[in-house]
Amino acid sequence: MKKKYVLLAAFAAAMLTPSVVWAQYPQITDEAKENYKKMMTEERKRSDEAWAKALPIVQKEAREGRPYIPWAGRPYDLPQADIPSFPGAEGGGMYSFGGRGGKVIVVTSLEDSGPGTLREACETGGARIIVFNVAGVIRLKSPISVRAPYVTIAGQTAPGDGICVTGQSFLIDTHDVVIRHMRFRRGAQDVAFRDDAVGGNAVGNIMVDHCSASWGLDENMSIYRHVYNRGADGHGLKLPTVNITIQNSIFSEALDTYNHAFGATIGGYNSMFCRNLFASNISRNSSVGMDLSLIHISEP
C-alpha cells in the first residue's frame, strides 16, 4: 500500500512540472510577443482617438435623452424601451434601445478599416443602425471595439451569403447593443493574442440574435461582466453585465491552441440564454461567470 502511495505522489509531481502543465500551450517567440505588444499599443491609441471623436456626440445625445451609463451594474441602472427591439425578441435584452431612432450607416466595404467599413460604423458616435450593401468576409487586422452606445448591427440586410467577421475579436464595450444575423470566426491568426470571438466589457441592454461565433482562442463568446474605470488611476471596478439576451445562436468549434477550446461564459443580472446550439467545444457549453440572475433555455 505504501509503495502505491509513493507511485501516485511521484506521478502527481511529474504532472505538475512546468513542461507538463504547459505542454499543450504554444511556444510563443519573443518576436511574436513584441509584435503583439506593438499591435495592441497601436490599436489602443487608434481606438482612443476614435473614441475622442465619438464622445462629444455621445455626451450631446445624453443631454437630449439618450443617457450614457458605463457604470451600470444593476438591471434598473439602465432605462429600457417600451417596445421590443424587434418582433421575436425575448428576455432581459428584449427592450434594448439599440440604434432605434438614430442615423442609418451603410457598410459599403469589406476592408478592415477606412470609409464605408464596419469598423468605421462601429466606432462612430451617436445612435446608429448599421446596414450592409455588401456581402462577404471582413478580415480584421486588429479587434473592433464598440465603445459608443445605442447601436443596431443588422446583418440580415446584407445581400448574398451575408457577412462574416474573421481574424480578430469583436468587442462589445458599451450598452444598448443589438446584433443580428452576423457570423464571427476569430481564428488563430496570431497565437500571441488569446481572446474570444465575441467578448469585451458589455455593460447591459445587450441583444444577440441569430448569430454564430466560432474559432475563439479563449471562448467563442463571453458576456457576463464589465470593468468600469472610475478614474485615471487604472483601477477598474468589476461589475455584472445587466439585461442580456443571447438567443437563436450557434457557438462552435473553439480552437484548442491554448488547450482552451471553450464554448461560452454567460451570466449577469436579468439575463436570458435561449434556443442556442453548442457544438465541438471541449467545455463551457456554457459556463456561468460572476453574478447570476439567469434563465437558460435549451430547445432542440
Regions found by a protein language model. Name each.
Residues 133, 154-159, 180, 185, ...:
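Feature marks extracellular polysaccharide-active and adherence modules
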Residues 118-126, 138-154, 163-180, 186-204:
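Extracellular beta-strand-rich solenoid/capping regions of secreted or surface-exposed proteins
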Residues 293-300:
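Residue-level detector of conserved catalytic or cofactor/ligand-binding positions
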Residues 9-17:
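Bacterial N-terminal signal peptides
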Residues 156, 161, 166, 182-188, ...:
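Surface-exposed loop/turn segments connecting beta-strands in extracellular beta-rich domains
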Residues 165-170, 191-200, 215-241, 257-268, ...:
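Extracellular beta-strand/beta-solenoid scaffold signature
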Residues 2-6, 19-111, 115-129:
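Extracellular "leader-to-stem" segments immediately downstream of a signal peptide or signal-anchor
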Residues 241, 246-247:
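Carboxylate/His-rich catalytic cores and anion/metal-binding grooves
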